[in-house]
A protein has these predicted regions:
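Acidic/polar-rich alpha-helix caps and helix-coil junctions
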Residues: 1-148
Length: 148
């Protein structure tokens, strides 16, 4: 079978660039990129700094705001609100592409899976399962595998 995969889409790159602007505290340019993304995904939506701060600065919901545990500094307030906005939009944009994993690892987001019978499996921030395993041929050549 022949499968074509798009390595980078314009929509995803807009969100990546907006995230870079957020860390530069250039919120106006981040808003412009977020607005460009929304123009193709949510017609009639107008984005502003105040709207992002109001929505993502409010009480967390399971879908819009996660507890973040990154190994880098995110300032509370406007920067955190914008980061939560970008993570929410990236979750929507990359839902079928497997890219959420990179945000989960980078931002230390805990993930809970509900299992039948009422049980839960929680992937905590320090869980060894977060490490991507070294390929088996490399392990076979003598390199120690990542602990699980």
């Amino acid at each position: 079978a022949h499968i074509v995969t798009t390595a980078f889409t314009t929509d995803e790159l807009l969100l990546c660039r907006a995230e870079a602007f957020i860390y530069q505290k250039d919120y106006d340019r981040a808003v412009a990129d977020i607005q460009a993304w929304c123009d193709t995904h949510a017609s009639g939506t107008t984005v502003s700094r105040s709207a992002i701060n109001q929505y993502y600065g409010s009480q967390a919901t399971e879908r819009t705001k996660k507890d973040l545990h990154p190994k880098f500094v995110i300032e509370n307030g406007e920067q955190l609100n914008f980061v939560n906005c970008i993570l929410h939009l990236r979750r929507i944009e990359t839902v079928h592409e497997g890219l959420r994993w990179f945000d989960i690892k980078r931002y230390g987001i805990e993930v809970t899976h509900n299992i039948s019978g009422g049980n839960e499996d929680v992937l905590k921030v320090d869980d060894l399962r977060r490490a991507i395993q070294i390929p088996t041929d490399v392990i076979g050549a003598g390199l120690t595998p990542n602990p699980r």
